[in-house]
């Protein structure tokens, strides 16, 4: 039988002798790695045990059904061909043109490398043309003709099996996408019915890549693998539901969690020995027999893609659409909490008080805002990260001595303007602020004399608005004491309270006295700012408190100072 098979195969395909050593060398990597090699089975004479009527019967069944599963498929085990490709390109499958066009994207790299692997020129290494008439067993009904047709079909489809295992990195997606679709137990898939009719779902469940094509009597191992894969995917779904509680963590934690689960699936499916074999097989970029990801493929596949394929999306023929659809499914399953404006206001108010609320504060906030405590905790983590990012960006964009974006502290650069001296010297950190203020004043009032020393001030890179001056202590500068500035402030209203600015600037002398008196109040205020977390929100709150204190100071001595002004 094997001699007849070799002779008829050679008569049908004259170039088969040049192919045989190529076939042997293309699978030498698999034999080194200890995997079942279909070439080894062929050389050992696996075809001898099959009589000619049985071979012709299975060949005719394959021709009628176009199915990858028969009751006993000798050539399928030898050909080492994925059932998905076998259905499209096998004898009787018709090698449909639309199937070839759809699979062209997945086999683009394999087509170019197949010509190199087979060692033959011409159409042997390319995407297969329509089948020759020798591959249709319906025309030959006798036993020898059927065997010859089977040999021709075997050699005809060998060029797909000899392609280097580059395009097989998607085999896990076929396996995982197809496995949850199977309504009956997988044993029914392997045995098949007496008529041998296989459903499309069963074809999908078998499409795990060339490494998992079962040998004769190797069906039970594949069944156990599929059952283990189903259980592992259910475990993955439960773990993903648990992971969604912390989905809005920082990005590095999220990526770590995504990378963790595909590795867990890989180890759970195979055990330590097969995992070591998978690590060795990564050099050849082939999938191991269980059809799981090798470590190299885990790095190549997007982590969200690998985790997101939970069998809910259908099998895609091209590799690009496969990853996109898995990613889309992943995005649909993950949800984000949308906070109302009231919830955000309350959370911001709590964040102003403390950046690190204890568990009681978080639970109280969660009860009040109708949120879970985990959501409140995640919001505070994200808010702290955003605050640190802004602080870092503020420290980079502003010079270190410029006080306005930074927090209030005991050594605030405004401290020289809070002492009792009526005309203190310039503080170098405020030079750009004075330049901006003088430029705005000169534009509004050309008759206003410039402040002393303004000609020697450095030009400001970005003019700061007058609203950055946080209190009346800044007005100790001589330019702010002239009455003309009162009209400027009353038109622009730069402070948080416009009435405070007008009251301070209508009477310049009480402004000086109020600023001097507020110097005594500066120490407890800055101590309170130190107790609070030093954030931008705390800075705004501090400015409001300072303006309120100055208003009270201006009202209390208002009668006596009014007489002095008159």
Curated annotation (Swiss-Prot):
Family: Belongs to the paired homeobox family. Bicoid subfamily.
Annotated compartments: Nucleus
Function summary: Transcription factor. Binds to specific sequence motif 5'-TAATTA-3' in regulatory elements of target genes, such as histone demethylase KDM5C. Positively modulates transcription of KDM5C. Activates expression of KDM5C synergistically with histone lysine demethylase PHF8 and perhaps in competition with transcription regulator ZNF711; synergy may be related to enrichment of histone H3K4me3 in regulatory elements. Required for normal brain development. Plays a role in neuronal proliferation, interneuronal migration and differentiation in the embryonic forebrain.
Upper classification of the organism: Eukaryota, Metazoa, Chordata, Craniata, Vertebrata
SUPFAM superfamilies: Homeodomain-like (SSF46689)
Keyword terms, alphabetized: Developmental protein, Differentiation, DNA-binding, Homeobox, Neurogenesis, Nucleus, Transcription, Transcription regulation
Ranges of Low complexity composition bias in the record: 144-154, 205-215
Start-end of Basic and acidic residues biased regions: 253-264, 294-312
One Gene Ontology cellular component annotation held by this UniProt entry: nucleus
Biased segments, Pro residues type: 126-135
Pfam families: Homeodomain, OAR
Keyword Nuclease: no
CDD domains: homeodomain
Segments of the chain annotated as binding DNA: 332-391
Disulfide bonds: none
Compositional bias per record (Acidic residues), positions renumbered to this chain: 222-252
Protein name (record): Homeobox protein ARX
Phosphoprotein found in the keyword field: no
Domain of life where this protein originates: Eukaryota
Gene Ontology terms for molecular function: chromatin binding; DNA-binding transcription activator activity, RNA polymerase II-specific; DNA-binding transcription factor activity, RNA polymerase II-specific; DNA-binding transcription repressor activity, RNA polymerase II-specific; RNA polymerase II cis-regulatory region sequence-specific DNA binding; RNA polymerase II transcription regulatory region sequence-specific DNA binding; sequence-specific double-stranded DNA binding
Biological process, per Gene Ontology: axon guidance; cell proliferation in forebrain; cerebral cortex GABAergic interneuron migration; cerebral cortex tangential migration; embryonic olfactory bulb interneuron precursor migration; epithelial cell fate commitment; forebrain development; globus pallidus development
């Amino acid at each position: 039988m094997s001699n007849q098979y070799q002779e008829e195969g050679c008569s049908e395909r004259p170039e088969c002798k040049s192919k045989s050593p190529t076939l042997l060398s293309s699978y030498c990597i698999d034999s080194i790695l200890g995997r079942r090699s279909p070439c080894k089975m062929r050389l050992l004479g696996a075809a001898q045990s099959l009589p000619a009527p049985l071979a012709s019967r299975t060949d005719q069944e394959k021709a009628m059904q176009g199915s990858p599963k028969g009751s006993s498929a000798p050539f399928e085990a030898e050909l080492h061909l994925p059932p998905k490709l076998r259905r499209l390109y096998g004898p009787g499958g018709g090698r449909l043109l639309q199937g070839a066009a759809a699979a062209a994207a997945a086999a683009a790299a394999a087509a170019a490398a197949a010509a190199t692997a087979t060692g033959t020129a011409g159409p042997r290494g390319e995407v297969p043309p329509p089948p020759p008439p020798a591959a249709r067993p319906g025309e030959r009904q006798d036993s020898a003709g059927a065997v010859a047709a089977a040999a021709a079909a075997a050699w005809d489809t060998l060029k797909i099996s000899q392609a280097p295992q580059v395009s097989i990195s998607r085999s896990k997606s076929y396996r995982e996408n197809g496995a949850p679709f199977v309504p009956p137990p997988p044993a029914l898939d392997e045995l098949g019915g007496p008529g041998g009719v296989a459903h499309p779902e069963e074809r999908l469940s078998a499409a795990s890549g060339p490494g998992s094509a079962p040998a004769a009597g190797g069906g039970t191992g594949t069944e156990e693998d599929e059952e283990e894969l189903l259980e592992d995917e259910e475990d993955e779904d439960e773990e993903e539901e648990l992971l969604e509680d912390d989905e809005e963590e920082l990005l590095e934690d999220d990526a770590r969690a995504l990378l963790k689960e595909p590795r867990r699936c890989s180890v759970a499916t195979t055990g330590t020995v097969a995992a070591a074999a998978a690590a060795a097989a990564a050099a050849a970029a082939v999938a191991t027999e269980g059809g799981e990801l090798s470590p190299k493929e885990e790095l190549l596949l997007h982590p969200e893609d690998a985790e997101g394929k939970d069998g809910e999306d259908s099998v895609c023929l091209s590799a690009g659409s496969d990853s996109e659809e898995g990613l889309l499914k992943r995005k649909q399953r993950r949800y984000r909490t949308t906070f109302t404006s009231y919830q955000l206001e309350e959370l911001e108010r709590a964040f102003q008080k403390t950046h690190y609320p204890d568990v009681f504060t978080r639970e109280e906030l969660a009860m009040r805002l109708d949120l879970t405590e985990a959501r409140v905790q995640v919001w505070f983590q994200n808010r702290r990260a955003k605050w640190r990012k802004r602080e870092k960006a503020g420290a980079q964009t502003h010079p270190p001595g410029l006080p306005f974006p930074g927090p209030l502290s005991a050594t605030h650069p405004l401290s020289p303007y809070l002492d009792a001296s009526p005309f203190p010297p310039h503080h170098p950190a405020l030079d750009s602020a004075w330049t901006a203020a003088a430029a705005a004043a000169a534009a509004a009032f050309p008759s206003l004399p410039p402040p002393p020393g303004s000609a020697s001030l450095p030009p400001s890179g970005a003019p700061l608005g007058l609203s950055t001056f946080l209190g009346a202590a800044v007005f100790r500068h001589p330019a702010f004491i002239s009455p003309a500035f009162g009209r400027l402030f009353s038109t622009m209203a730069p402070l948080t309270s416009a009435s405070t600015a007008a009251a301070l600037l209508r009477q310049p002398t009480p402004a000086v006295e109020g600023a001097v008196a507020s110097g005594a109040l500066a120490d407890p205020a800055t101590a309170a700012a130190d107790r609070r977390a030093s954030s931008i929100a705390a800075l705004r709150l501090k400015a409001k408190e300072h303006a309120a204190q100055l208003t009270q100071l201006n009202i209390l001595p208002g009668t006596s100072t009014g007489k002095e002004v008159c």
